[in-house]
């Protein structure tokens, strides 16, 4: 397959342009060829060609430009570059959705799973994280992320947000135990307001209100003090969580090591 050098084709649409990286293909006739885009090309193309028809949501007319030598068998003496006037008609644009999320309070990483995600031209602008609201804590308390740093998707089905500072503190308080419900009995939820995916058609409401969150974390012990007079052992750690029903810790799992490496 080498009739058409696909890497010399550039798509133009919403917010800019993108040069394909998919493999070369053969023509199917004297008047046509087709390309099945690789995964990276699809993510970019879907962001540019984000609305059915011949123009993007921002009214940019779709175009495919072919740089010189795109038709590999043409004579070197003939200029075959074809840069303008090559419209693209788009169909079957899918509405992006969120389906679920997981949160690790050790790392602060929120991994969101969805369908039909695609990239926006530029860097760190695929997902507007200020549109994401988490529910948990007591009486279904909510918190909307405040970080000004937007992020890129990792694939057509997922993206991840690393929380820090005030965002992590607030989210840890809401998602305060492992599983899908808080110690206060609230079901964890992730809601995304409209326009959460930057490249989506602005005229289409893509808000997504109900998506479960599953919390996982590894509690850590950092130090301990012991009062010999009272027999009180006070343990300090991180990510300690309420059980939600029954004892929070199992003291039989603790082992003490003393001088001489003796243990109890």
What residue spans do the PLM features occupy?
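Non-catalytic beta-sheet/beta-sandwich ligand-binding modules that flank or precede catalytic cores
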Residues: 1-264
């Amino acid at each position: 397959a080498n009739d058409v050098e696909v890497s010399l084709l550039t798509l133009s649409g919403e917010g800019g342009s993108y040069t394909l990286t998919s493999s070369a293909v053969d023509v199917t006739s004297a008047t046509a060829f087709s390309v099945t885009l690789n995964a990276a090309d699809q993510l970019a193309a879907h962001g540019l060609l984000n609305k059915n028809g011949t123009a993007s949501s921002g009214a940019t007319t779709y175009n495919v430009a072919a740089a010189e030598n795109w038709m590999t068998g043409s004579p070197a003496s003939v200029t075959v570059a074809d840069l303008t006037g090559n419209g693209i008609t788009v169909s079957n644009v899918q509405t992006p959705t969120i389906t679920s999320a997981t949160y690790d309070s050790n790392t602060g990483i929120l991994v969101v799973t969805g369908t039909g995600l695609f990239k926006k031209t530029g860097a760190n602008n695929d997902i507007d994280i200020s549109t994401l609201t988490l529910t948990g804590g007591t009486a279904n308390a909510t918190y909307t992320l405040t970080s000004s740093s937007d992020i890129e998707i990792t694939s057509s089905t997922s993206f991840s947000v690393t929380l820090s500072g005030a965002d992590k503190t607030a989210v840890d308080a809401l998602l305060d135990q492992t599983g899908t419900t808080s110690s206060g009995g609230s079901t964890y939820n992730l809601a995304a307001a409209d326009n959460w995916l930057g490249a989506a058609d602005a005229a289409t409401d893509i808000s997504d209100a109900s998506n479960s969150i599953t919390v996982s974390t590894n509690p850590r012990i950092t130090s301990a003090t012991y009062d010999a007079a009272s027999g009180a052992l006070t343990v300090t750690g991180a990510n300690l969580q309420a059980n939600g029903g029954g004892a929070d810790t199992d003291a039989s799992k603790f082992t003490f090591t003393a001088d001489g490496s003796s243990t109890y």
